[in-house]
């Protein structure tokens, strides 16, 4: 009997298209390896689909919000379904670049210089302070990335 794998991809984040591509590639590899694969999208019917399918394991092929941030991992834990990848805490911490870098630095790992700028500090009157902090701590050219997204969408 083949192991049943629920492959979750797509999702609602800005990284949906990347996730769908990942899902197609993972699905092909799993089928080629001999697994029975059901592909599911992250939507309002996900819990019902997982309860009906009762997979042996869930493969999370989501990128960004809800897939890499610990949310889906928490849901799967509640449902009692094993999954591939890190758990809730590790996923949540890793998705947050600022927290991850603080933890890395505490362990003595070298990290590039960075400045965390909130959306509120980009509004007047905080904008000048944010620019001053960037000018003081970083060199141009520089890279701007969202703190809690991956896949470098829009960069």
Go through each PLM region and give its residues.
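Eukaryote-biased intrinsically disordered, low-complexity acidic regions enriched in Ser/Thr/Pro
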Residues: 40-52
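Glycine- and acidic-residue-enriched helix-capping/strand-helix junction motifs
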Residues: 13-23
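Active-site charged/polar residues at nucleotide-handling catalytic sites that mediate phosphoryl
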Residues: 53-54, 138
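A structural preference for short, hydrophobic beta-strand core positions in alpha/beta folds
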Residues: 39-40, 85
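A short, GP-enriched loop/loop-strand-helix hinge that lies immediately N-terminal to
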Residues: 8-15, 54-96, 110-119
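Active-site nucleotide/adenylate-binding loops and adjacent lid/helix of ATP-dependent enzymes
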Residues: 1, 5-9, 93-155
């Amino acid at each position: 009997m083949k192991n049943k794998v629920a492959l979750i991809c797509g999702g609602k984040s800005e990284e949906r298209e990347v996730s769908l591509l990942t899902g197609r590639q993972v699905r092909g590899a799993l089928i080629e390896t001999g697994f029975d694969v059901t592909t599911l999208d992250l939507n309002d019917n996900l819990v019902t689909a997982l309860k009906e399918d009762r997979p042996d394991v869930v493969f999370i092929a989501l990128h960004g919000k809800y897939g890499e941030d610990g949310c889906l991992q928490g849901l799967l834990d509640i449902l009692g379904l094993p999954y591939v990848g890190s758990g809730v805490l590790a996923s949540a911490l890793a998705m947050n670049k600022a927290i991850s870098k603080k933890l890395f630095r505490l362990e003595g790992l070298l990290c590039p210089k960075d400045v965390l700028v909130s959306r509120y500090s980009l509004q007047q009157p905080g904008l000048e302070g944010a620019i001053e902090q960037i000018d003081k701590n970083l060199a141009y050219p520089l890279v701007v990335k969202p703190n809690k997204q991956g896949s470098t969408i829009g960069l």
